[in-house]
Amino acid sequence: MPLRGVTALSDFRVEKLLQKAAALGLPEVKLSSEFWYFAGSEKALDAATVEKLQALLAAQSVEQTPEAREGLHLFLVTPRLGTISPWASKATNIAENCGLAGIERIERGMAVWLEGALTDEQKQQWAALLHDRMTESVLPDFQTASKLFHHLKSETFSTVDVLGGGKEALVKANTETGLALSADEIDYLVENYQALQRNPSDVELMMFAQANSEHCRHKIFNADFILNGEKQPKSLFGMIRDTHNAHPEGTVVAYKDNSSVIKGAKIERFYPNAAENQGYRFHEEDTHIIMKVETHNHPTAIAPFAGAATGAGGEIRDEGATGKGSRPKAGLTGFTVSNLNIPDLKQPWEQDYGKPEHISSPLDIMIEGPIGGAAFNNEFGRPNLLGYFRTFEEKFDGQVRGYHKPIMIAGGLGSIQAQQTHKDEIPEGALLIQLGGPGMLIGLGGGAASSMDTGTNDASLDFNSVQRGNPEIERRAQEVIDRCWQLGDQNPIISIHDVGAGGLSNAFPELVNDAGRGAVFELREVPLEEHGLTPLQIWCNESQERYVLSILEKDLDTFRAICERERCPFAVVGTATDDGHLKVRDDLFSNNPVDLPLNVLLGKPPKTTRTDKTVTPSKKPFHAGDIDITEAAYRVLRLPAVAAKNFLITIGDRSVGGMTHRDQMVGKYQTPVADCAVTMMGFNTYRGEAMSMGEKPAVALFDAPASGRMCVGEAITNIAAVNIGDIGNIKLSANWMAACGNEGEDEKLYRTVEAVSKACQALDLSIPVGKDSLSMKTVWQDGEEKKSVVSPLSLIISAFAPVKDVRKTVTPELKNVEGSVLLFIDLGFGKARMGGSAFGQVYNNMSGDAPDLDDAGRLKAFYSVIQQLVAEDKLLAYHDRSDGGLFATLAEMAFAARCGISADIDCLMDKFLPIHLPDFQGDPAEDLSDELYNHAAIKILFNEELGAVIQIRQKDRDYVDAAFETAGLTDAVSRIGSPDFDNEFISFFGYGYFLEQNRADLQRAWQETSHAIQRLRDNPACADSEFALIGDNERSALFADVKFDVNEDIAAPFINSGAKPKIAILREQGVNGQIEMAAAFTRAGFDAYDVHMSDLMAGRFRLADFKMLAACGGFSYGDVLGAGEGWAKSILFHPALRDQFAAFFADPNTLTLGVCNGCQMVSNLAEIIPGAETWPKFKRNLSEQFEARLNMVHVPKSASLILNEMQDSSLPVVVSHGEGRADFALHGGNISADLGIALQYVDGQNQVTQTYPLNPNGSPQGIAGITNADGRVTIMMPHPERVYRAAQMSRKPEGWTELSGWYRLFAGARKALG
């Protein structure tokens, strides 16, 4: 059944499409669009169901669909035929929970109408513009949409005739199906199947290919190496293990699980207690830290959104499946691509070399990929707090080096109970379970495909190898895992793995093989969302959001109850055996698609030997005396590795969970310059965790081992200003990217691993976890020319550490302290090597020597001094030197404070000249030629040796100097100037001024790339509005003007009375903000309970048992029918629930708070809330983008009981939403004078604002929150529950100690209830 919806594309989206069409030379057309919905059912729906369906979808059923005609062309964009979209899964869930019987599935399409004359070829070009071929189809008419619901006929497996056709038969199958088997592996399989006297099934071959792919088995890291004719003594992995063997202390799990586990602390963890009817309680327990980082490069090249999304999702599952279950906490993301070539902003260093047709352009990757990664993290509910973004594409020694195959890195940290850190052994007879989403025909052969050079595979096989993500169901699965580990020693999970490359065919065998078991599986028990899949497709597809785990049969009822409460699908698929044999039975065809010993699959296929030789790069001396230093400064600031990353950061929720202390944004202007991320371990502690990154790929072209050491060094200098203590507390993850097989690259990889291993051992560091991606080469045919782009060896180091006190973290924001000074610590000790620098890149000047960590002991000493200064509160600001050199370091510190800097490099010049011009004897001010002076100044300002700038008080100068002297680092330290808060000029002088520029002008250049991509991706008017605020310090600044004593707890008398009103912390599937909500209300003296909508439906809880209701933030049902709409309709369409909620809202003795998704949901219940007749709905942000920011709000006088104690105050608060714009279309666009506006966005001058992003969503009158007539029901889009502690705020106002101003809201609610 088709149903017609509302307009699909906003005016600016239409305009962007028309501009793209014009750029392709397409004729002018008029474009209109609308959503269409298609409901599949086995029989015709009755009138009552159709009416409900129309209300649910806000759409109208039609008897006849419109058709294209002469001059009016229809493009019906639907989910790709043969697939089921995540949107459909969630929409169908809503329909089921709303009681709509008989609906098999609901899909959504978009009808685009083009009015004008178009040829068939032009229509094909338009079709390409209108859809993503990875996930969508374009249909010519509405009748074809019926194919969305076609079911294929089931087929059995096929075999490859190795008994009759021998090795040649397998070689042919290998090529045709993209198995990526080596010649040795083909011989191994032929030998084993001939011994078994049977032919392999296609299922077994695909399973073997995935399980033994480079992606899964890391064959190169375990290989023997012969370099320059000599066999090397150790494998790559052996050298990595050496770091752990030398320094195992502080590491709990290394090399043998989905993630590494490092030592944490005993803290009070906060979660619902099943033994106390899901009451939230603190639990004192030893809690360790999970660390994991991996890459998803190949899928991101093919389909950036889906590739990055599933990269984030897979890494999250790795964390959750560590030990016997754990909780992911905070994420990191990074991207490396070739040159962007942004239209109208092509940079002078960029040349367009071309690319293969089937991979995405670097610009498309950076428009779509970050949204995919952020969207998954956002919807799952994990803050993304750290990252990097680099572009590189240069001709070097006759080869084009770059990242046509991009790096997309996803990682993070999590928390795990000490007693859950190690998996138990699976006994015979244990049940083998799939938890999470159903199988679909996506992601076939991803492990093998990602192990091949991009372009060597058939495009259709690359296409098949990419997965699609559904974070909402992964959230449900994680809730099940949480409920299990929270049972402590009653946890039913024996062992758990995530489902990744190879799908179930890799995950289940891995699960049982770890315990030395075999297994019998029933293929038709695997949950599927598509009919007609072959056994190979069922067993090997890489559908996401799945885990495999084992439990005892006696625990099945407990596990089932948890899954049903969380509405998370699961199935018992198999049973563990003690015979070491793997059998997969197919009852449909009464055969066994898999039937072989596990040791054939996971045994010891032939060990790889790598042979390579040293290829020495050509060396050119660096010279830049003829380059204008001011122009150089602006160029360097525009290079993406240096430039602002706002467009990557504000799309990602950075506060969900309420544990964030330090995100990327720093200071009262929220400038993206943080060196590292810091989280808190719990709500009752200042202990925490920190993570940082280091990567230097361009340096590897000059000296690969040096690049490895520099990566380690950068990770340390980035994390050094956090209160960690001994350097050995820091643990590293190493992700290795290389174009192995390209001459010289295997040798570089070996020597770099060797160098990093030695450096880490010298630094007392270990690498307990890592990953590799060793096919970083793109090849393609361009007409008659064969082209290739080879990535430099690329190591990414991620550092993780426990933190003693998060409050001592020092940021790059300069402080307005009279008489403060800036000290520069140069760990390059004047060498100023320029190889691989940002400066070199922006001038295509690939010359000079590579910077290096020459003495690990001196870096260790530097770290120790900074730790001492952090612990003693001697640092006002800290920023490491990295991309862009000292110039960029100082500029970013000035940007964060919006001040000037006066920097004198005389002393640096005095150190530079004896090293680089030893024969020079004159006066630099008089006798140095302009060219030599310019050359020296450029090297001093733009070299990227390790180092840092610190701001200290003048009175602490002697103490600081003494600390560096004691550490033997006096020769590294120079006083280079001071901040200037009286003007905004960034000035560098040394024997005269040579660079002086206005801060705002430099910052505009720094933010230009981010602004340009934001304009292309989002509403360009919003991007322009944000860019314009760079020069407006007054309106941009955060401040606090509170009319109450922040440190007074007005709930204290009620807490002391011992009476605890019960509050229902309400959530629906997909909600992710319940923990911090419960923690805030618990702090204010409430007795908080975890109440799922399934509990209310099943009668396990009744709202009448509670005094207050808090509806939490997140993505109920993935926001598929509009934010909060599906959640609200599951109440309104359910008579018993509707009555229960209506009675609660009518009770004069209750309070209700709805935040974010809860705000959106409660606004849709206005018809059953007394005094809410004038309320708006909340619609998509004006930017049409998810907005995560720290915004200023004002609390006007209103009837709101929970805000009563905060009236007339203004203070910063977190916002994180995609649909927060108050929309009054229901009221004819009119805002009633009776509307109870309870919260408004204001600017830095405390004026209600419409200016983006000070008003992040475009709400009229700055509306951020509203209340009903009697003030008992208050809803708001911002998140006060995430910032009720001062340490949770990215920027803490002066005078706020333990509690923030937002605690008053929760204390006010307690006071209002008496």
Swiss-Prot record:
Cellular compartments per GO CC: cytoplasm
Coiled coil region boundaries: none
Source taxon at top rank: Bacteria
InterPro entries, A to Z: Class_I_gatase-like (IPR029062), FGAR-AT_N (IPR040707), FGAR-AT_PurM_N-like (IPR055181), PurL_large (IPR010073), PurL_linker (IPR041609), PurM-like_C_dom (IPR010918), PurM-like_C_sf (IPR036676), PurM-like_N_sf (IPR036921)
Major enzyme class: ligase
EC number assigned by the record: 6.3.5.3
One matching Pfam family: GATase_5
Physiological role: Phosphoribosylformylglycinamidine synthase involved in the purines biosynthetic pathway. Catalyzes the ATP-dependent conversion of formylglycinamide ribonucleotide (FGAR) and glutamine to yield formylglycinamidine ribonucleotide (FGAM) and glutamate.
Protein name, entry field: Phosphoribosylformylglycinamidine synthase
Residues noted as binding ATP in the record, renumbered to the chain: 307-318, 674, 882
Reaction it catalyzes: N(2)-formyl-N(1)-(5-phospho-beta-D-ribosyl)glycinamide + L-glutamine + ATP + H2O = 2-formamido-N(1)-(5-O-phospho-beta-D-ribosyl)acetamidine + L-glutamate + ADP + phosphate + H(+)
Name of encoding gene: purL
Active site: 1156 (nucleophile), 1279, 1281
Annotated keywords: ATP-binding, Cytoplasm, Glutamine amidotransferase, Ligase, Magnesium, Metal-binding, Nucleotide-binding, Purine biosynthesis
Location of the Glutamine amidotransferase type-1 domain: 1063-1314
SUPFAM superfamilies: Class I glutamine amidotransferase-like (SSF52317), FGAM synthase PurL, linker domain (SSF109736), PurM C-terminal domain-like (SSF56042), PurM N-terminal domain-like (SSF55326), PurS-like (SSF82697)
